Amino acid sequence: MSDSIPHPALSGRRVLIPGGTGGVGEGAVRSYLAAGAQVVVPTRSKERAEEFRLLLGEAATARLHLFEHDYTDFAGAEALVATMVDRLGGVDDVVAPIGGWWHGKRLWEIDEADWQAAFVSLATAHMAVLRAALPRMTRQGAYFIVVGEAAHVPIPGSGLVSMEQTALQMMHQVLAVELQGAKRVFLLELGPVATRFVEAVDPAQVTSAQIGAVAVTASASTRPGSSVRLLNRAQAEEALVSLGAAR
């Protein structure tokens, strides 16, 4: 993946990106590394970590830290963040493109395994990372909850995805009220994303590189937390201009 988007300097910032090995996460990892940050990405295995390092190529500098950690439950996320604090001294920013896609059944056709996999497990992973990382984050940083278009568009056969994504939207709203500006939390609302997994890319689609650039620019800015719509390439370009002006 090529990325010619300029990034503000974030030298010394310590960034956690659970889900960083995925298509959207890759863009965030590349962008924060390009900005000079220390980037922590949890992986399921050493083999997966090596595959991701090879994928990144020259972008995988010494500032990339691949931790073999399962962060999908409360204990695992707590251990991950504790390890990051122990090794890097703290946490400044978190970008959480956690999740996947699920399709195939109408709501009344699902079984308990579907419910656990497509709703409970993903919501738990987001909550686990948030509760472990947010209290430890510095005030200069930002937390990014990442959701897809299913959060506000009902998709037949993928209702559990829409329900889980909408829950994350409410998580962001509750955090805004509870934090009262003490720390910054952004909600990135994505449309269809052009990633390494997409063969036929629509030129109007937002790219993972743009999403990463928006997160980096928001991290570097003084803009309070907010909801940022990145449903297409044009909205991403507008967000970069708006957030850049707040630096």
Indicate residue ranges for each PLM-predicted region.
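Catalytic loop of short-chain dehydrogenase/reductase
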Residues: 114-128, 139-177, 189-194
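N-terminal Rossmann-fold NAD(P) dinucleotide-binding loop
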Residues: 25-26
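Conserved glycine-rich Rossmann-like NAD(P)H-binding loop of the short-chain dehydrogenase/reductase
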Residues: 36-51
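Flexible N-terminal pre-Rossmann segment of NAD(P)-dependent oxidoreductases
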Residues: 1-17, 241-247
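Rossmann-fold cofactor-recognition segment
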Residues: 56-75
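Conserved glycine-rich cofactor-binding loop
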Residues: 21-22
